């Protein structure tokens, strides 16, 4: 994500008060790019340069850090030279006691281009050529079009106006990034679990179907009912049918139904009681007559007993 930032630095300009220090010609300043040329101005800087005083060359360039930079020398950011600290460093040192005492700070805006080149030598001509090529590319895209901003080489730049710079950076803090990463990992794990569950469901269904088929297979392997009727006698079939719970329930239901039919109601019992008495009396008479007849026939059929006296 691209984040808009502004960078302002302080530069030392020559004071109007007369001094006997050695002055450098204006031609040295004109050798620098237009956006790095320093011109005297009456605007004091409101920015604090303490943030720029930390870096790898703090001890070696303490003089330049203390008094900032003379307009003759070139300022480079560490990111341009392969370093990644938030500070500035000078290509060549300056004699602060003889040169920088007559300068005061003013605000100057510079570009921090995102390209990283190898830090080889301190040749000013090579560095200027590289910087000019970079600034030409940046001016077409990154430089603002407002009239209040820094102007091109033809006009005097407004040194107090900062230049907007676009750089790539993350809009989220490290702690927030960690939370976001954890949430993403949790979501991924939940998705993986859901996919695993979806994949396991058809497998479980297939396993259950396989178990049911295995249970049904021994029943199919047995002989058909037609074969059983041929091999088993009808008595055994009746016994098996009676022994089965379904047949027992059917028989019990049929018996109970028939018993219910045989049992007469109370009215039928009252009506049939005199008839039964008459029938019973008639049957008793018939039985008595039959008994008498049988006795008579038995008496007739019995042979005569021989009398021993007659013999």
Swiss-Prot record:
Going by the UniProt record, its keywords in alphabetical order are:
Phosphoprotein
Q: Where is the composition biased (Basic residues)?
A: 203-218
Q: According to the UniProt record, which cysteines are disulfide-bonded?
A: none
A single BP term in Gene Ontology? mitochondrion organization
The biased composition feature labelled Polar residues covers 139-155
List the biased-composition ranges (Basic and acidic residues): 191-202, 245-266
Signal peptide from the UniProt entry: none
Modified positions (Phosphoserine) in chain numbering: 224, 256, 265-266, 302, 311
UniProt KW Disulfide bond keyword: no
Locate the region Disordered.
139-159, 184-311
Asked if the Swiss-Prot or TrEMBL record annotates the protein with the keyword Magnesium, the reply is no
Molecular function in Gene Ontology: cyclin binding; phospholipase A2 activity
Concerning its family, UniProt says:
Belongs to the PROCA1 family.
Q: What is this protein called?
A: Protein PROCA1
Tell me the organism: Rattus norvegicus (Rat)
